[in-house]
Protein backbone atom coordinates (compact mmCIF):
# COMPACT_ATOMS: atom_id res chain seq x y z
CA UNK A 1 0.00 0.00 0.00
CA UNK A 2 2.84 2.34 0.88
CA UNK A 3 4.50 1.63 -2.49
CA UNK A 4 1.27 2.46 -4.35
CA UNK A 5 0.97 5.78 -2.55
CA UNK A 6 4.62 6.56 -3.29
CA UNK A 7 4.17 5.72 -6.99
CA UNK A 8 1.04 7.88 -7.22
CA UNK A 9 2.83 10.82 -5.63
CA UNK A 10 5.82 10.35 -7.95
CA UNK A 11 3.60 10.23 -11.05
CA UNK A 12 1.71 13.39 -9.98
CA UNK A 13 4.98 15.20 -9.34
CA UNK A 14 6.43 14.18 -12.71
CA UNK A 15 3.25 15.25 -14.49
CA UNK A 16 3.40 18.64 -12.77
CA UNK A 17 7.09 19.03 -13.58
CA UNK A 18 6.52 18.15 -17.23
CA UNK A 19 3.41 20.30 -17.66
CA UNK A 20 3.45 23.86 -18.93
CA UNK A 21 3.43 26.37 -16.12
CA UNK A 22 -0.08 27.38 -15.07
CA UNK A 23 -0.69 30.59 -13.17
CA UNK A 24 -1.51 30.54 -9.46
CA UNK A 25 -5.15 31.29 -8.67
CA UNK A 26 -4.16 34.56 -7.00
CA UNK A 27 -2.90 35.75 -10.42
CA UNK A 28 -5.73 34.34 -12.54
CA UNK A 29 -6.97 36.89 -15.06
CA UNK A 30 -9.46 36.72 -17.92
CA UNK A 31 -7.80 37.13 -21.30
CA UNK A 32 -8.57 37.67 -24.98
CA UNK A 33 -6.18 36.51 -27.68
CA UNK A 34 -5.87 34.46 -30.86
CA UNK A 35 -7.86 31.26 -30.49
CA UNK A 36 -9.73 32.65 -27.48
CA UNK A 37 -11.17 35.99 -28.49
CA UNK A 38 -13.67 36.14 -25.64
CA UNK A 39 -12.90 35.07 -22.06
CA UNK A 40 -15.77 35.41 -19.59
CA UNK A 41 -15.56 34.27 -15.95
CA UNK A 42 -18.62 34.05 -13.71
CA UNK A 43 -18.33 33.08 -10.05
CA UNK A 44 -20.54 32.95 -6.99
CA UNK A 45 -18.75 33.13 -3.66
CA UNK A 46 -19.96 32.72 -0.09
CA UNK A 47 -17.89 34.59 2.50
CA UNK A 48 -18.24 34.16 6.24
CA UNK A 49 -16.15 36.16 8.71
CA UNK A 50 -16.20 35.93 12.49
CA UNK A 51 -14.41 38.55 14.60
CA UNK A 52 -14.16 37.90 18.33
CA UNK A 53 -12.38 39.81 21.06
CA UNK A 54 -12.40 41.27 24.55
CA UNK A 55 -13.23 44.87 25.44
CA UNK A 56 -11.44 46.24 28.47
CA UNK A 57 -11.68 49.70 29.99
CA UNK A 58 -9.20 51.85 31.82
CA UNK A 59 -9.91 52.34 35.51
CA UNK A 60 -7.99 54.20 38.18
CA UNK A 61 -6.38 51.93 40.77
CA UNK A 62 -4.91 53.70 43.84
CA UNK A 63 -3.13 50.48 44.84
CA UNK A 64 -1.13 50.41 41.59
CA UNK A 65 2.16 52.31 41.48
CA UNK A 66 1.90 53.65 45.08
CA UNK A 67 1.67 56.33 46.23
CA UNK A 68 0.54 57.82 42.91
CA UNK A 69 -1.86 55.17 41.63
CA UNK A 70 -2.27 54.21 37.96
CA UNK A 71 -4.79 53.33 35.30
CA UNK A 72 -5.33 49.61 34.77
CA UNK A 73 -7.37 47.76 32.15
CA UNK A 74 -10.35 45.90 33.61
CA UNK A 75 -12.36 43.28 31.74
CA UNK A 76 -15.76 44.52 30.57
CA UNK A 77 -17.21 42.72 27.54
CA UNK A 78 -16.84 39.85 25.11
CA UNK A 79 -17.64 40.89 21.55
CA UNK A 80 -18.51 38.88 18.42
CA UNK A 81 -19.24 40.03 14.89
CA UNK A 82 -20.42 37.50 12.28
CA UNK A 83 -20.81 38.48 8.63
CA UNK A 84 -22.24 36.31 5.86
CA UNK A 85 -22.32 37.49 2.25
CA UNK A 86 -22.95 36.15 -1.25
CA UNK A 87 -20.69 37.73 -3.86
CA UNK A 88 -21.38 37.26 -7.59
CA UNK A 89 -18.34 38.24 -9.67
CA UNK A 90 -18.05 38.81 -13.41
CA UNK A 91 -14.79 39.21 -15.34
CA UNK A 92 -14.32 39.84 -19.07
CA UNK A 93 -11.04 39.55 -20.98
CA UNK A 94 -10.44 42.62 -23.15
CA UNK A 95 -6.95 41.82 -24.40
CA UNK A 96 -4.09 39.49 -23.63
CA UNK A 97 -4.11 39.04 -19.83
CA UNK A 98 -6.21 42.18 -19.39
CA UNK A 99 -9.61 42.01 -17.68
CA UNK A 100 -12.29 44.20 -16.23
CA UNK A 101 -14.35 42.79 -13.38
CA UNK A 102 -17.23 43.69 -11.11
CA UNK A 103 -18.52 42.30 -7.81
CA UNK A 104 -22.13 42.72 -6.63
CA UNK A 105 -22.24 41.55 -3.00
CA UNK A 106 -25.39 40.82 -1.06
CA UNK A 107 -24.94 40.81 2.71
CA UNK A 108 -27.15 38.16 4.27
CA UNK A 109 -26.27 39.19 7.83
CA UNK A 110 -23.75 41.35 9.68
CA UNK A 111 -24.52 40.88 13.37
CA UNK A 112 -22.71 42.38 16.36
CA UNK A 113 -23.11 40.74 19.79
CA UNK A 114 -21.73 41.47 23.24
CA UNK A 115 -22.05 40.21 26.79
CA UNK A 116 -20.28 40.77 30.08
CA UNK A 117 -16.84 39.22 30.37
CA UNK A 118 -16.19 36.48 32.90
CA UNK A 119 -13.60 36.79 35.66
CA UNK A 120 -13.01 33.69 37.78
CA UNK A 121 -16.04 32.16 36.07
CA UNK A 122 -18.44 34.96 37.06
CA UNK A 123 -19.82 37.86 34.96
CA UNK A 124 -18.39 41.27 35.82
CA UNK A 125 -21.83 42.93 35.74
CA UNK A 126 -21.86 43.85 39.45
CA UNK A 127 -18.56 45.75 39.22
CA UNK A 128 -18.76 46.86 35.59
CA UNK A 129 -17.93 50.52 34.93
CA UNK A 130 -20.52 50.37 32.12
CA UNK A 131 -23.36 49.45 34.48
CA UNK A 132 -22.17 51.66 37.34
CA UNK A 133 -21.54 54.79 35.28
CA UNK A 134 -22.73 57.99 37.01
CA UNK A 135 -21.75 60.77 34.55
CA UNK A 136 -22.94 62.09 31.19
CA UNK A 137 -20.95 63.14 28.11
CA UNK A 138 -20.01 66.45 29.80
CA UNK A 139 -18.60 64.79 32.94
CA UNK A 140 -21.65 65.94 34.92
CA UNK A 141 -23.55 63.68 37.35
CA UNK A 142 -26.48 61.90 35.70
CA UNK A 143 -28.51 62.34 38.86
CA UNK A 144 -27.99 64.72 41.82
CA UNK A 145 -28.75 61.81 44.12
CA UNK A 146 -25.93 59.73 42.66
CA UNK A 147 -28.07 57.23 40.74
CA UNK A 148 -26.34 55.28 38.01
CA UNK A 149 -26.95 55.69 34.29
CA UNK A 150 -25.45 52.74 32.36
CA UNK A 151 -23.57 53.69 29.21
CA UNK A 152 -25.62 51.23 27.13
CA UNK A 153 -27.61 48.03 27.66
CA UNK A 154 -25.73 44.76 28.13
CA UNK A 155 -27.73 41.53 28.23
CA UNK A 156 -26.81 37.87 28.29
CA UNK A 157 -26.05 38.15 24.58
CA UNK A 158 -27.14 41.54 23.26
CA UNK A 159 -27.15 41.55 19.45
CA UNK A 160 -27.58 44.36 16.95
CA UNK A 161 -28.64 42.94 13.60
CA UNK A 162 -27.65 44.25 10.18
CA UNK A 163 -28.00 42.84 6.68
CA UNK A 164 -30.54 41.59 4.19
CA UNK A 165 -29.35 44.25 1.75
CA UNK A 166 -27.07 44.75 -1.22
CA UNK A 167 -23.52 45.75 -0.34
CA UNK A 168 -21.08 48.14 -1.98
CA UNK A 169 -20.43 47.46 -5.67
CA UNK A 170 -16.78 46.92 -6.55
CA UNK A 171 -15.32 47.25 -10.06
CA UNK A 172 -11.78 47.12 -11.31
CA UNK A 173 -9.17 46.18 -13.86
CA UNK A 174 -6.32 43.64 -13.71
CA UNK A 175 -3.42 43.27 -16.13
CA UNK A 176 -0.85 40.52 -16.41
CA UNK A 177 2.20 42.47 -17.60
CA UNK A 178 4.47 39.40 -17.78
CA UNK A 179 3.55 35.72 -18.02
CA UNK A 180 5.88 32.86 -17.15
CA UNK A 181 3.70 30.59 -19.31
CA UNK A 182 4.68 32.64 -22.38
CA UNK A 183 8.23 33.54 -21.36
CA UNK A 184 9.85 31.25 -18.80
CA UNK A 185 12.58 33.81 -18.12
CA UNK A 186 10.05 36.07 -16.41
CA UNK A 187 7.61 35.69 -13.51
CA UNK A 188 3.89 36.27 -13.83
CA UNK A 189 3.40 39.90 -12.86
CA UNK A 190 -0.12 41.12 -12.21
CA UNK A 191 -1.15 44.67 -11.37
CA UNK A 192 -4.66 45.77 -10.57
CA UNK A 193 -6.87 48.57 -9.33
CA UNK A 194 -10.32 48.32 -7.75
CA UNK A 195 -12.87 51.00 -6.94
CA UNK A 196 -15.58 50.36 -4.35
CA UNK A 197 -18.66 52.53 -4.81
CA UNK A 198 -20.68 53.73 -1.76
CA UNK A 199 -23.88 52.01 -2.91
CA UNK A 200 -24.94 50.22 0.30
CA UNK A 201 -27.57 51.94 2.47
CA UNK A 202 -25.95 54.19 5.09
CA UNK A 203 -25.88 53.08 8.73
CA UNK A 204 -26.80 55.77 11.26
CA UNK A 205 -25.77 54.35 14.66
CA UNK A 206 -27.54 57.03 16.74
CA UNK A 207 -30.94 57.03 15.02
CA UNK A 208 -33.96 55.60 16.82
CA UNK A 209 -32.27 54.94 20.16
CA UNK A 210 -34.49 54.19 23.16
CA UNK A 211 -34.40 55.96 26.54
CA UNK A 212 -31.92 53.31 27.74
CA UNK A 213 -29.82 53.97 24.61
CA UNK A 214 -30.68 50.59 23.07
CA UNK A 215 -30.40 50.28 19.30
CA UNK A 216 -33.65 49.87 17.34
CA UNK A 217 -32.01 46.91 15.59
CA UNK A 218 -31.76 44.57 18.60
CA UNK A 219 -34.63 42.60 17.04
CA UNK A 220 -33.74 40.14 14.27
CA UNK A 221 -36.96 41.20 12.55
CA UNK A 222 -35.64 44.75 12.14
CA UNK A 223 -32.09 44.49 10.78
CA UNK A 224 -30.30 47.76 10.20
CA UNK A 225 -28.25 49.05 7.30
CA UNK A 226 -24.47 48.61 7.30
CA UNK A 227 -23.19 50.94 4.58
CA UNK A 228 -20.23 53.20 5.41
CA UNK A 229 -20.79 55.50 2.39
CA UNK A 230 -17.11 55.89 1.51
CA UNK A 231 -15.19 55.49 -1.74
CA UNK A 232 -12.43 52.89 -1.54
CA UNK A 233 -9.43 52.75 -3.86
CA UNK A 234 -7.38 49.56 -3.84
CA UNK A 235 -4.09 49.15 -5.73
CA UNK A 236 -2.29 45.82 -5.76
CA UNK A 237 0.47 43.87 -7.45
CA UNK A 238 1.25 40.16 -7.46
CA UNK A 239 4.40 38.30 -8.53
CA UNK A 240 4.40 34.53 -9.02
CA UNK A 241 6.78 32.03 -10.61
CA UNK A 242 5.93 28.38 -11.25
CA UNK A 243 8.76 26.06 -10.19
CA UNK A 244 7.61 22.57 -11.07
CA UNK A 245 4.81 21.58 -8.66
CA UNK A 246 5.31 24.73 -6.54
CA UNK A 247 4.10 28.22 -7.41
CA UNK A 248 5.39 30.74 -4.84
CA UNK A 249 3.94 34.24 -4.92
CA UNK A 250 4.09 37.65 -3.31
CA UNK A 251 1.36 40.30 -3.12
CA UNK A 252 1.36 43.90 -1.93
CA UNK A 253 -1.67 46.16 -1.70
CA UNK A 254 -2.75 49.53 -0.38
CA UNK A 255 -6.29 50.80 0.18
CA UNK A 256 -7.26 54.44 0.50
CA UNK A 257 -10.68 55.85 1.36
CA UNK A 258 -12.53 59.07 0.62
CA UNK A 259 -15.67 60.46 2.22
CA UNK A 260 -18.80 60.79 0.12
CA UNK A 261 -21.68 63.20 0.64
CA UNK A 262 -23.44 60.47 2.66
CA UNK A 263 -20.62 59.56 5.06
CA UNK A 264 -21.90 59.60 8.64
CA UNK A 265 -20.63 62.13 11.19
CA UNK A 266 -21.23 62.38 14.93
CA UNK A 267 -22.27 65.98 14.28
CA UNK A 268 -25.45 64.83 12.51
CA UNK A 269 -27.23 64.35 15.85
CA UNK A 270 -24.94 66.30 18.19
CA UNK A 271 -27.44 69.07 19.04
CA UNK A 272 -30.31 66.72 19.94
CA UNK A 273 -28.01 64.30 21.78
CA UNK A 274 -26.58 67.11 23.90
CA UNK A 275 -30.13 67.93 25.08
CA UNK A 276 -30.92 64.37 26.14
CA UNK A 277 -30.98 63.32 29.76
CA UNK A 278 -28.36 62.07 30.34
CA UNK A 279 -26.51 64.03 27.68
CA UNK A 280 -24.95 61.91 24.92
CA UNK A 281 -22.88 64.80 23.52
CA UNK A 282 -21.47 68.08 24.84
CA UNK A 283 -23.35 71.35 24.33
CA UNK A 284 -20.16 73.19 23.36
CA UNK A 285 -19.16 70.41 20.98
CA UNK A 286 -22.53 70.51 19.23
CA UNK A 287 -22.13 74.27 18.76
CA UNK A 288 -18.61 73.76 17.36
CA UNK A 289 -19.61 71.33 14.59
CA UNK A 290 -20.00 74.09 12.03
CA UNK A 291 -16.78 75.95 12.84
CA UNK A 292 -14.69 72.77 12.99
CA UNK A 293 -15.87 71.68 9.54
CA UNK A 294 -14.02 68.66 8.16
CA UNK A 295 -11.98 68.33 11.37
CA UNK A 296 -15.15 67.15 13.12
CA UNK A 297 -16.20 64.65 10.45
CA UNK A 298 -15.22 61.02 9.99
CA UNK A 299 -11.46 60.48 9.65
CA UNK A 300 -10.93 57.50 7.39
CA UNK A 301 -8.13 54.93 7.66
CA UNK A 302 -5.77 53.66 5.02
CA UNK A 303 -4.71 50.03 4.86
CA UNK A 304 -1.50 48.50 3.53
CA UNK A 305 -0.56 44.86 3.45
CA UNK A 306 1.79 42.11 2.29
CA UNK A 307 1.08 38.47 1.48
CA UNK A 308 3.58 35.64 1.01
CA UNK A 309 2.46 32.21 -0.09
CA UNK A 310 2.74 29.27 -2.42
CA UNK A 311 0.45 26.99 -4.35
CA UNK A 312 1.35 23.31 -4.27
CA UNK A 313 0.15 21.40 -7.33
CA UNK A 314 -0.11 17.64 -6.60
CA UNK A 315 -2.04 16.97 -9.82
CA UNK A 316 -2.32 18.66 -13.20
CA UNK A 317 -3.51 17.42 -16.60
CA UNK A 318 -3.08 20.21 -19.17
CA UNK A 319 -4.70 18.25 -22.00
CA UNK A 320 -7.95 18.03 -20.01
CA UNK A 321 -7.53 21.41 -18.31
CA UNK A 322 -7.63 19.73 -14.91
CA UNK A 323 -5.73 20.82 -11.86
CA UNK A 324 -5.68 20.35 -8.09
CA UNK A 325 -3.78 22.91 -6.04
CA UNK A 326 -3.30 23.67 -2.38
CA UNK A 327 -2.73 27.29 -1.33
CA UNK A 328 -0.79 28.18 1.83
CA UNK A 329 -0.16 31.82 2.66
CA UNK A 330 0.71 34.26 5.44
CA UNK A 331 -0.42 37.88 5.43
CA UNK A 332 -0.16 41.08 7.44
CA UNK A 333 -2.20 44.29 7.08
CA UNK A 334 -1.62 47.64 8.77
CA UNK A 335 -4.71 49.78 9.49
CA UNK A 336 -4.03 53.42 10.31
CA UNK A 337 -5.65 55.55 13.01
CA UNK A 338 -9.19 56.69 12.29
CA UNK A 339 -12.44 58.14 13.54
CA UNK A 340 -14.89 55.68 12.10
CA UNK A 341 -17.09 52.67 12.82
CA UNK A 342 -15.52 50.15 15.21
CA UNK A 343 -16.71 47.39 17.61
CA UNK A 344 -17.88 50.03 20.10
CA UNK A 345 -20.18 51.81 17.61
CA UNK A 346 -23.28 49.61 17.90
CA UNK A 347 -23.09 49.92 21.69
CA UNK A 348 -22.37 53.65 21.97
CA UNK A 349 -24.12 54.97 18.84
CA UNK A 350 -20.97 56.89 17.87
CA UNK A 351 -17.99 56.93 15.57
CA UNK A 352 -14.85 56.59 17.69
CA UNK A 353 -11.17 57.42 17.47
CA UNK A 354 -9.39 54.11 16.93
CA UNK A 355 -5.68 53.43 17.33
CA UNK A 356 -3.69 51.94 14.45
CA UNK A 357 -3.30 48.18 14.58
CA UNK A 358 -1.79 45.24 12.74
CA UNK A 359 -3.72 42.20 11.48
CA UNK A 360 -1.63 39.04 11.00
CA UNK A 361 -2.76 35.62 9.88
CA UNK A 362 -2.64 32.66 7.56
CA UNK A 363 -4.83 31.02 4.94
CA UNK A 364 -5.26 27.48 3.64
CA UNK A 365 -7.02 27.01 0.31
CA UNK A 366 -8.00 24.11 -1.93
CA UNK A 367 -8.71 24.70 -5.63
CA UNK A 368 -10.19 22.03 -7.90
CA UNK A 369 -10.32 22.65 -11.64
CA UNK A 370 -12.53 19.96 -13.21
CA UNK A 371 -12.30 21.24 -16.78
CA UNK A 372 -11.71 24.35 -18.83
CA UNK A 373 -15.17 25.52 -17.86
CA UNK A 374 -15.67 24.61 -14.19
CA UNK A 375 -13.65 25.02 -10.99
CA UNK A 376 -14.33 25.05 -7.26
CA UNK A 377 -12.48 27.09 -4.64
CA UNK A 378 -12.53 26.78 -0.85
CA UNK A 379 -10.39 28.48 1.77
CA UNK A 380 -10.17 29.05 5.51
CA UNK A 381 -8.17 31.76 7.26
CA UNK A 382 -7.29 32.63 10.84
CA UNK A 383 -5.86 35.96 11.96
CA UNK A 384 -5.40 38.16 15.00
CA UNK A 385 -5.17 41.90 15.61
CA UNK A 386 -2.78 43.70 17.89
CA UNK A 387 -4.47 45.26 20.93
CA UNK A 388 -5.67 48.80 20.29
CA UNK A 389 -7.81 51.54 21.84
CA UNK A 390 -11.35 51.90 20.50
CA UNK A 391 -11.84 55.37 22.00
CA UNK A 392 -9.67 58.32 22.91
CA UNK A 393 -10.54 61.53 21.07
CA UNK A 394 -8.34 64.56 21.65
CA UNK A 395 -9.93 67.20 23.87
CA UNK A 396 -9.28 70.03 21.43
CA UNK A 397 -7.37 71.01 18.31
CA UNK A 398 -3.88 69.57 18.38
CA UNK A 399 -4.81 67.52 21.43
CA UNK A 400 -5.34 70.48 23.78
CA UNK A 401 -8.07 72.96 24.68
CA UNK A 402 -7.74 76.39 26.27
CA UNK A 403 -7.31 75.69 29.97
CA UNK A 404 -8.78 79.09 30.76
CA UNK A 405 -12.17 78.06 29.38
CA UNK A 406 -14.74 75.47 30.37
CA UNK A 407 -13.51 72.13 29.01
CA UNK A 408 -16.50 70.10 30.20
CA UNK A 409 -18.59 71.26 27.25
CA UNK A 410 -21.40 72.70 29.38
CA UNK A 411 -20.63 76.26 28.27
CA UNK A 412 -19.17 77.64 25.05
CA UNK A 413 -15.59 76.77 24.17
CA UNK A 414 -14.67 77.01 20.46
CA UNK A 415 -11.58 74.85 20.99
CA UNK A 416 -13.51 71.81 22.29
CA UNK A 417 -13.60 68.79 19.96
CA UNK A 418 -17.24 68.13 18.92
CA UNK A 419 -16.57 64.37 19.10
CA UNK A 420 -15.19 64.40 22.65
CA UNK A 421 -17.21 62.44 25.21
CA UNK A 422 -15.89 62.38 28.78
CA UNK A 423 -17.26 58.87 29.33
CA UNK A 424 -15.32 57.30 26.46
CA UNK A 425 -12.38 59.55 25.64
CA UNK A 426 -10.92 60.79 28.93
CA UNK A 427 -7.77 58.94 30.06
CA UNK A 428 -8.88 56.44 32.67
CA UNK A 429 -12.15 55.72 30.82
CA UNK A 430 -10.99 54.61 27.37
CA UNK A 431 -11.99 51.26 25.86
CA UNK A 432 -9.46 48.81 24.44
CA UNK A 433 -9.84 45.79 22.12
CA UNK A 434 -7.63 42.75 22.68
CA UNK A 435 -7.44 38.94 22.49
CA UNK A 436 -8.91 39.08 19.00
CA UNK A 437 -9.41 36.29 16.51
CA UNK A 438 -10.66 36.64 12.95
CA UNK A 439 -11.85 33.41 11.34
CA UNK A 440 -12.86 33.40 7.70
CA UNK A 441 -14.42 30.84 5.37
CA UNK A 442 -14.90 31.21 1.63
CA UNK A 443 -16.41 28.82 -0.93
CA UNK A 444 -16.82 29.65 -4.61
CA UNK A 445 -17.89 28.05 -7.86
CA UNK A 446 -16.44 29.43 -11.10
CA UNK A 447 -17.68 29.07 -14.67
CA UNK A 448 -15.27 30.07 -17.42
CA UNK A 449 -16.24 30.57 -21.05
Description of each model-found segment:
Residues 35, 77-85, 162-168, 184-186, ...:
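Transmembrane beta-barrel outer-membrane domains
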Residues 44-52, 104-110, 168, 177, ...:
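Transmembrane beta-strands of outer-membrane beta-barrel pores
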Residues 24-38, 97, 113, 178-189, ...:
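Short loop/turn motifs that connect adjacent beta-strands in outer-membrane beta-barrel proteins
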Residues 127-131, 261-449:
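Outer membrane beta-barrel transmembrane domains
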Residues 38-44, 100-102, 171, 187-193, ...:
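Transmembrane beta-strands of outer-membrane beta-barrel proteins
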Residues 111-299, 418-429:
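Outer-membrane pore/translocation modules
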Residues 20-73, 182-186, 320, 424, ...:
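Outer-membrane beta-barrel biogenesis signature
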Residues 91-97, 105, 174-180, 238-244, ...:
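Structural signature of outer-membrane beta-barrel channels/translocons
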